[in-house]
Regions:
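A detector for small-residue-rich transmembrane helices and their helix-helix packing motifs
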Residues: 2-194
Length: 194
């Protein structure tokens, strides 16, 4: 008998589900903990131009100001994340990490002097990526996804403008900017390869 190595392989759809559901569960778990009496994890968010607030770049996307804040982010995040995963799960992680780090760093540098938390910076990054990538790459798939995003979420454009004092428009603006940057870069790179 030949010695065959078996490898565990996750079907692509299952890995998309795992990726998106994993982030949703992490955010929900942290909100449950944050809701317990005497616990305030939001202090781990981004506090602009403070050395201790710099670490918030890594924590802010997973923390939320309350259940309404979390829920308002989860549905559009799940849809936009699923659309990015149509390219690949690896592509999703590249966009997620880039928008979280670059958008978060820009919030730390230029944001108002209060704590910034929430998945919406990354959500806007996914949105910016999907639109820019579709425009720049110009494949049928990329354009179709961009059209869906514009149809479903064209109203997000207003979130990059200061409207309410308790909403971090900076996270929205810099997340979208980071998404546009990575969308432009990856579209140009992918066009050279194809």
């Amino acid at each position: 008998m030949a010695n065959q190595k078996s490898s565990l392989s996750i079907p692509p759809l299952a890995s998309k589900r795992f990726t998106i559901i994993g982030i949703i569960l992490l955010c929900t778990l942290l909100q449950v903990i944050n809701s317990l009496p005497g616990i305030n994890l939001n202090g781990l968010g981004i506090y602009p131009r403070s050395l201790s607030g710099l670490s918030g770049i890594f924590f802010a996307p997973f923390l939320h100001g309350g259940w309404a804040h979390l829920i308002s982010n989860l549905i559009p995040f799940a849809i936009l994340a699923w659309l990015v995963c149509q390219y690949s799960v690896k592509r999703f992680w590249v966009v997620f990490i880039f928008t979280a780090l670059v958008g978060g760093l820009l919030v730390w540098l230029f944001g108002r002097g209060n704590i910034h938390v929430g998945l919406s910076g990354v959500l806007y990054g996914l949105w910016g990526f999907l639109i820019c990538y579709g425009i720049m790459h110009r494949s049928f798939k990329a354009i179709a996804i961009s059209v869906v995003v514009l149809f479903l979420y064209s109203g997000l454009i207003w979130g990059v403008l200061p409207q309410r004092p308790h909403v971090s428009f900076e996270s929205h603006f810099f997340g979208a900017l980071a998404g546009i940057l990575i969308g432009y870069y990856l579209a140009k790179k992918d066009k050279k390869i194809s």
